[in-house]
């Protein structure tokens, strides 16, 4: 999982990526291509 400062660029890497909020943190999840997962620090 990649740790990034801005999730805007992480979301635009794949069309299926979506932003979710869990436990006060923002995550990018991608069901079709899980290597695009990211979390905002």
From Swiss-Prot:
One of its GO terms (biological process) is translation. Pfam families: Ribosomal_L36. It comes from the Bacteria. GO terms for cellular component: ribonucleoprotein complex; ribosome. InterPro entries: Ribosomal_bL36, Ribosomal_bL36_sp, Ribosomal_L36_bact. The keyword Endoplasmic reticulum does not apply. One of its GO terms (molecular function) is structural constituent of ribosome. SUPFAM superfamilies: Ribosomal protein L36. The keyword Ribosomal protein applies. Keywords: Ribonucleoprotein, Ribosomal protein. Coiled coil: none annotated. NCBIfam families: PRK00831.1, rpmJ_bact. Belongs to the bacterial ribosomal protein bL36 family. This is Large ribosomal subunit protein bL36B. The lineage of its organism: Bacteria, Pseudomonadati, Pseudomonadota, Gammaproteobacteria, Vibrionales.
């Amino acid at each position: 999982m990649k740790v990034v400062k801005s999730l805007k660029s992480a979301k635009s890497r794949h069309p299926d990526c979506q932003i979710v909020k869990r436990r006060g943190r923002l995550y990018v999840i991608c069901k079709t291509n899980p290597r695009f997962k990211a979390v905002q620090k």
